[in-house]
């Protein structure tokens, strides 16, 4: 136990100025291999993780995703890694995640895991779906080399900053013809369809439709002095 008065008082300290640490995109060979793999993909999926957020790299991720025209899913607890307003966004994987995201990544032949450790909460089965694409080629990008290939078998590992890596890959793919270019519209329609189906299912979860619940809601609404809606 520490006496409370020990936590009070004044001391002389020097607060250091913040420094900016240069973070690179990863090795040239790894970037070239990743670009080749993405160029050959028929149904690529981009998995955006916490590294995108911490690296302030959402804009770079959007640019890369739009070049690929691919579905984008969020890693567990990192819904802010890609904007939900974007048509290619599909929602989070894993625990209490989006069925649309899981169904789409299950179809992937190449997954670009950008700034994510691929932890178990975002890769294990959910909604009775074992959705992780066992046969897909995985490109994992993480600033910590110890995370590369730790959880999932990968084809290419890139130790680099998520934003710098996304920018480098976009530059490598900018003038190339991609295998998935021919199916861009078809894949966009598939993405939109899966999202619409998931939204419809969520609507059924949101509103009570059974007779008992409807009667209880009506009874509560009509109760005098009850100002709180039953659903709240």
What is the predicted role of each segment?
Residues 4-26, 180-187, 198, 205-206:
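Aromatic-enriched
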Residues 18-32, 214-217:
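An N-terminal, well-structured beta->alpha segment
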Residues 26, 33-111, 230-232:
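Anionic-ligand anchoring segments at beta-strand to alpha-helix junctions in alpha/beta enzyme folds, i.e.
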């Amino acid at each position: 136990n520490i006496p409370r008065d020990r936590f009070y008082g004044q001391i002389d300290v020097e607060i250091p100025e913040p420094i900016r640490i240069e973070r690179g995109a990863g090795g040239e060979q790894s970037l070239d291999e990743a670009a080749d793999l993405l160029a050959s993909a028929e149904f690529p999926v981009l998995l955006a993780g916490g590294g995108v957020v911490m690296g302030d790299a959402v804009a770079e991720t959007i640019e890369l995703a739009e070049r690929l025209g691919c579905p984008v899913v969020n890693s567990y607890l990192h819904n802010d890694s890609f904007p939900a307003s974007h048509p290619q966004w599909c929602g989070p994987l894993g625990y209490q995640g989006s069925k649309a995201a899981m169904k789409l990544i299950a179809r992937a032949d190449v997954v670009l895991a950008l700034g994510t450790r691929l932890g178990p909460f975002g890769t294990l089965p959910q909604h009775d779906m074992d959705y992780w694409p066992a046969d897909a080629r995985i490109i994992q990008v993480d600033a910590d080399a110890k995370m590369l290939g730790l959880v999932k078998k990968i084809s290419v590992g890139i130790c680099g900053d998520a934003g710098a890596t996304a920018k480098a890959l976009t530059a490598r793919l900018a003038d190339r013809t991609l295998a998935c270019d021919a199916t861009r519209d078809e894949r966009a329609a598939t993405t939109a369809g899966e999202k619409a189906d998931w939204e419809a299912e969520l609507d059924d979860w949101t509103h009570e439709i059974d007779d008992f619940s409807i009667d209880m809601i009506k009874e509560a609404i009509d109760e005098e002095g009850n100002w709180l809606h039953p659903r709240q």
